């Protein structure tokens, strides 16, 4: 989505699920298309503006400020599904997935076609080690955006954490085809794939 750039940070932070060593650098994630979204709730301008400020802060890694602004947006409009989803993913990272998931669920109940919330839910479920649920939500993102590199990559990490070699390699290959060196660099340092490092197909 052109108005949402924070999916990238979710991918970057998800690297914290497992690095062999060093600090993960941010891959360049594509935006999730807004065209698929069916509007079901009109967000008031003041709440929308606060949400955009929150998303910008989150995209810069300023999560405390992003949460403060997201809460302000929600105070202005309790059904601002964009702010609810953003709050949910922040809480999922900073407190626990169980704290964040209900806010993302509420966002999806208000706007079921909001693809960013599907992505946020996929990441939150992965953080909670609910790998099958995470795969379901990444697949929803791919249904709306078949070229979404980091959803293929997210599915690959889920299968890797489940020690499903064949599926992990299959989805990782799809991610590499779309994302190239950014994906290769991420996979080379994240311990999701540690058990595959000596595998000829992984190399």
Language-model region placement:
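C-terminal motif of bacterial Sec signal peptides marking the signal peptidase cleavage site
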Residues: 14-16
């Amino acid at each position: 989505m052109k108005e949402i750039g924070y999916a990238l940070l979710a991918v970057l932070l998800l690297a914290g699920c497992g690095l062999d060593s060093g600090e993960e650098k941010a891959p360049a994630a594509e935006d999730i298309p807004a065209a698929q979204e069916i509007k079901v709730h009109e967000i008031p301008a003041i709440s929308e503006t606060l949400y955009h400020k929150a998303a910008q802060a989150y995209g810069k890694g300023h999560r405390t400020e992003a949460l403060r602004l997201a809460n302000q947006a929600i105070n202005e409009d309790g059904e601002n599904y964009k702010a609810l989803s953003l709050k949910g993913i922040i809480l999922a990272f900073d407190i626990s997935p169980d704290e964040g998931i209900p806010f993302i669920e509420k966002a999806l109940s208000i706007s079921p076609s909001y693809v960013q919330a599907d992505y946020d839910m996929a990441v939150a479920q992965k953080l909670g080690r609910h790998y099958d649920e995470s795969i379901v939500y990444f697949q929803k993102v791919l249904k709306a955006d078949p070229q979404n590199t980091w959803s293929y990559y997210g599915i690959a990490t889920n299968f890797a954490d489940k020690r499903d070699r064949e599926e992990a390699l299959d989805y990782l290959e799809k991610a590499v085809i779309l994302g190239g060196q950014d994906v290769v660099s991420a996979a080379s340092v994240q311990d999701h794939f540690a058990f595959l490092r000596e595998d000829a197909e992984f190399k």
